[in-house]
Amino acid sequence: MKPENKLPVLDLISAEMKTVVNTLQPDLPPWPATGTIAEQRQYYTLERRFWNVGAPEMATRAYRVPTKYGQVKTRIFYPQPDRPATLFYLHGGGFILGNLDTHDRIMRLLASYSQCTVIGIDYTLSPEARFPQAIEEIVAACCYFHQQAEDYQINMSRIGFAGDSAGAMLALASALWLRDKQIDCGKVAGVLLWYGLYGLRDSVTRRLLGGVWDGLTQQDLQMYEEAYLSNDADRESPYYCLFNNDLTREVPPCFIAGAEFDPLLDDSRLLYQTLAAHQQPCEFKLYSGMLHAFLHYSRMMKTADDALRDGARFFSDRLQQD
């Protein structure tokens, strides 16, 4: 697609999204476009500090949990003494960026709105870790907390997975991994997915959308994929191209959130249509005027806060139905 044939996205986004795009952090250096991944990670963490200010205070604990790849950092958020369930959160960042600090506010708000314990898992980033290491680390962390639930004062009888962008793929992939390999870590009551990628190689939205404003050009997406996967065959794995998995049975209830001007929107639409066609419990919600990654901006945008509340409500409703 020639760039001039793409939609003029920055002219079409909502007023509140434009406010975020135009927000300048005066002490922030330019994005290191030609820098190393380490430099980009450092910048991303610095840039996200502004957006994590003002999150709800609650009891928080940090722990390292064992996996076959070594110890993985986790952060547990306890919003209240009563804990109806535990949500595992997987951060986005194209598999190569992000950590527990860059998504701290998101996790705190999700814990506050759901009133469930939230555990963030700091899975090893790519390219240091190649598929399926991140999924195996997530599953190992779930198993560990299931076995040690009493020690950590958490309820692991009912669990959920949640994530944004690449983290959304990891969330659903982990839930399917548990199902397929018959691993008991508690009943998966729901999966919360914000603007994820689920395996499409091409789509209408990937052609019409994506640019320097969201880091999701076709070249960007190819770079993330090459960093994450071990080899070409992994592209068809049912835990990377989730449409190659069996989505006709025993898929946990899914809340699927899409952003109107996200190149990955068609991934979310296809996931919803597939699940709905096979009577798998799911809900799709489109957030008008939004760019990819809008969930970060709840400090300034009501729509971002609404999207977190919507996911929390979906999960709470599923708990009530059990």
Curated annotation (Swiss-Prot):
SUPFAM superfamilies, A to Z: alpha/beta-Hydrolases
Class of this enzyme: hydrolase
Keyword entries, A-Z: Cytoplasm, Hydrolase, Serine esterase
InterPro entries: AB_hydrolase_3, AB_hydrolase_fold, Acetyl_esterase, GDXG_lipolytic_enzyme, Lipase_GDXG_HIS_AS, Lipase_GDXG_put_SER_AS
Catalytic residues (UniProt): S165, D262, H292
UniProt-recorded Gene Ontology molecular function terms: carboxylic ester hydrolase activity
Motif (Involved in the stabilization of the negatively charged intermediate by the formation of the oxyanion hole): 91-93
EC number from the UniProt entry: 3.1.1.-
Function in brief: Displays esterase activity towards short chain fatty esters (acyl chain length of up to 8 carbons). Able to hydrolyze triacetylglycerol (triacetin) and tributyrylglycerol (tributyrin), but not trioleylglycerol (triolein) or cholesterol oleate. Negatively regulates MalT activity by antagonizing maltotriose binding. Inhibits MelA galactosidase activity.
PANTHER family noted in UniProt: AB HYDROLASE SUPERFAMILY PROTEIN C4A8.06C, ALPHA_BETA HYDROLASE FOLD-3 DOMAIN-CONTAINING PROTEIN-RELATED
Entry similarity comment: Belongs to the 'GDXG' lipolytic enzyme family.
Subunit description: Homodimer. Interacts with MalT and MelA.
Protein name: Acetyl esterase
Organism for this UniProt entry: Escherichia coli O6:K15:H31 (strain 536 / UPEC)
